[in-house]
């Protein structure tokens, strides 16, 4: 473990919830790949990683279980899903519209839906970043990728 190495080296989603649609699973795979490639993840009060993150749902709560690369316990943070419910619901609705649009809509229609989708995704990302304040310091791009994974878990659950 290198002191000050504040990044994720592995991210795992709760597999007990099951799989989702191919589109959602693709989003999950891309988000995890991008997250591992580039992220900023600093649990408050810890000397440094890299870290492994297990994201799960338990009793309608979002659970972030963090360990070091070699498995040493760092922290577990449990967040209420309530602040995310409306955002995730809106995000799923617009994603369904987006996936339908890419099959048959005009490029301008697809672009308009995609702009709305990105806006809602940004709102969810900022909400997640805010909810982790004082627990884990992350940058906005890391928050975006983590929010995608929260949505995947929510969709499965």
From Swiss-Prot:
Xref: Pfam families: UPF0262
Membrane-spanning intervals of the chain: none
InterPro entries: UCP032146
Family of this protein: Belongs to the UPF0262 family.
Annotated protein name in UniProt: UPF0262 protein RHECIAT_CH0000657
């Amino acid at each position: 473990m290198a002191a000050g190495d504040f990044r994720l080296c592995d991210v795992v989603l709760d597999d007990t919830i099951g799989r989702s649609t191919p589109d959602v699973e693709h989003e999950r795979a891309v988000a995890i790949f991008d997250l591992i490639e580039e992220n900023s993840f600093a649990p408050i009060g810890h000397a440094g990683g890299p870290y492994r993150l297990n994201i799960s749902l338990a009793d309608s709560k979002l659970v972030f279980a963090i360990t070091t690369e070699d498995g040493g316990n760092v922290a577990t943070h449990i967040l209420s899903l309530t602040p995310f419910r409306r955002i995730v619901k809106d995000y799923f609705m617009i994603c369904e519209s987006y996936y339908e649009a890419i099959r048959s809509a005009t490029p301008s229609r697809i672009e308009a839906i995609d702009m709305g989708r990105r806006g809602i995704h940004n709102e969810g990302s900022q909400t997640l970043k805010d909810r982790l304040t004082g627990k884990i310091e992350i940058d906005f791009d890391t928050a975006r990728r983590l929010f995608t994974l929260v949505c995947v878990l929510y969709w499965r659950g």
